[in-house]
Amino acid sequence: LIVEGNLKEENQQFTNAGIQTHTESLKDSIAYFTKNLEIDVANPSSDPKVFENIKNLEEYDGLIWGGSSLNIYNDTIEIRRQIEFMKESQKKIKKILAICWGMQVAVTAAGGEVRKCQKGTHRGIAHQIQINDNGLKHPLYKNKKNNFNTPAFNFDEVSKIPDNAILLSSNKINKVQGLNFKINECDVWGIQSVSYTHL
């Protein structure tokens, strides 16, 4: 299952400009590795009946939740729908890869906190992401240099990680660049960068 973080109206603007949506980009990234997957897409913000329009969440092997231009602290009805959908996903799907906005939603749903960046923003590239000792042991960063740059675009950051979460990487702007936590029976991997090459 892929969850689209942007509103339907914003995705239409991307399409009109000839730019891929986050979901389309994720599908291309996955297709690079395998085409032997059945992929469904959900958009909790723009689909009030999202639970009726997809399979039972227990049937999915995993979930990838991508980026968005939304700010979670704005607490709109569309954002609340995403948080609620994430909470249900964390109860019923065993593996979640949460990217950028997706990580912020996953953290919030699990009791963590997100705020505006305090030390600057990423506008194109996140520089000098340092993988810590926990990250070097984690499969998320397998064969990755322990200090790297990657595409990123974010104005917000995780300020409090969920209980029992493990910090995997940081840089000067965002202390939380990568993390891992388990909630219910779900294993959540989160990265702040918008680069989908981690897949």
Model region roles, listed by residue range:
Residues T197-H198:
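Conserved small/polar residues in nucleotide/adenosyl-binding loops
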Residues N16-A31:
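Short catalytic helix/loop segments, enriched in acidic residues and glycine
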Residues L37-S46:
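A short beta-strand-loop structural module common to alpha/beta enzyme folds
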Residues F51-E59:
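Short amphipathic alpha-helix with an adjacent loop that forms part of the alpha/beta core around
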Residues I2-A17:
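Short glycine-rich His-centered loop
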Residues S68-G135:
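Cysteine-nucleophile active-site neighborhood
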Residues K142-E185, G190:
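Catalytic beta-strand/loop cores that center a nucleophilic Ser/Cys/Thr
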